[in-house]
Amino acid sequence: MLIAALLVGPSTTPAYAGAAAPPAKLAPCLACHGADGQSQTAGVPSLGGQPSKYLLIQLFLFREGLRTAAPMNALTKGWSDAELQQAADFLARLPPPKPPADAGDPARLVPARALIADNHCNVCHRPDFSGQDNVPRLADQREDYLLTALRGYKSGVRRGYDSTMAEVLQPIGEAQLPDCAYYLSHWRPGK
């Protein structure tokens, strides 16, 4: 057995902290979204720690062509409902993204915190922005992804499964969206 292990060499499969290995169909997804749930790819969200129900809905929307993003539609085409659920459950068990090393620029954080509080983002996304049920985690998400999503909702390009985000973002100016994304991507308790 030892000889076989030496011949095969070290494993290149990431350890999943005692969790089961990812479903086979999820492998291409992890290449961009991160094997540990934390994306290192520009414009691609981190999925670790997202609520399973939220992930399931998004995967369903991609599969059905109700939300478009290359290559997600092609990757999920033909997935069964059970495969969507397995993928969502696996991703939800991965650790949430780590906050960036820098604590953030107070000149950007303070006004964004007030704007986010005034618009009650924490009501749906929770006070710690960890998300719940069908509402995504925003805390420590990639800033570039958050900004793209916020702009998409505000402009109506990204519709989601209801109009809540488009309505909530209407009073927020386009020029304020970058600071909102910055704040959420640098979120820490007590900030």
Where are these regions (language model features)?
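C-terminal capping alpha-helices of c-type cytochrome domains
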Residues: 77-99, 144, 170-191
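Gly/Gly-Pro-rich "capping" loops immediately C-terminal to redox-active cysteine motifs
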Residues: 22, 37-68, 73-79, 117, ...
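Sequence/structural segment immediately N-terminal to covalent heme-attachment motifs in c-type
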Residues: 16-38, 99-127, 142
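Extracytoplasmic/secreted proteins, especially bacterial periplasmic and envelope-associated proteins
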Residues: 28, 54, 71-74, 86, ...
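Generic helix-packing signal
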Residues: 26, 41, 92, 116, ...
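Inter-heme linker and motif-flanking segments adjacent to c-type heme-binding CXXCH motifs
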Residues: 38-39, 68, 93-107, 122, ...
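Bacterial N-terminal signal peptides
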Residues: 1-11, 22
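Generic structural signal for well-ordered, non-membrane alpha-helices
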Residues: 27-30, 57, 89, 114, ...
